[in-house]
């Protein structure tokens, strides 16, 4: 069994360099919620140095709230903004002798696209227009995954080690209790269960089916690095190969 382990980078976290030694894919902020041209270049160089797959992490234009504010934008606006961000990172990767492999939306853009077919379509269309060989990463079972499949893109269904789930397989909103899994043992058991059995227990006690092709670990938590090391070791103990 194989699993991809991904982390968001270029968002101002001091742990980026250490995380790159543990993950197989990096989602690099493209300036709309965090980062700038210099951090994008630095992140690409670090990813290449560590043999980590490079991906774009486009967002709503919301630096003030780290891309976590809900927005109502026209699909064509989202298409243009997504194309702009992923095109910039693709150019930087190419200039450094690398290749951008995937796209994973950030924050509220990711969450809204999981449920909004028009928004999901705009993102998938932009990814396809930029490069139809790119992998589109989205929440397992979401509208974004369906939109990617509609455009013939390779999709990668994502689960989260440190997020609570609702009975329908969606994430608990960050504004609600249970959104974050702060107990390390719980997070480890939840992640292994999703990867090995394709199920996750919701905060209300029901079991939801999920497809786990990539696991997101966040680098901004208090014990993020220690947990990432534990999770990687647990995968290796079970002969689960970590690869993009």
From Swiss-Prot:
CDD domains: LamB_YcsF_YbgL_like
Enzyme class, spelled out: hydrolase
EC number, as in UniProt: 3.5.2.9
GO MF annotation: an example: 5-oxoprolinase (ATP-hydrolyzing) activity
Pfam families referenced in this protein's UniProt entry, alphabetically: LamB_YcsF
A Gene Ontology BP annotation from the UniProt entry: carbohydrate metabolic process
Record's keyword terms, sorted: ATP-binding, Hydrolase, Nucleotide-binding
InterPro entries reported in the protein's UniProt record: Glyco_hydro/deAcase_b/a-brl, LamB/YcsF/PxpA-like
Summary of subunit composition and partner proteins: Forms a complex composed of PxpA, PxpB and PxpC.
Family stated for the protein in its record: Belongs to the LamB/PxpA family.
Reported function: Catalyzes the cleavage of 5-oxoproline to form L-glutamate coupled to the hydrolysis of ATP to ADP and inorganic phosphate.
Name of the protein in its database record: 5-oxoprolinase subunit A
Species annotation: Citrobacter koseri (strain ATCC BAA-895 / CDC 4225-83 / SGSC4696)
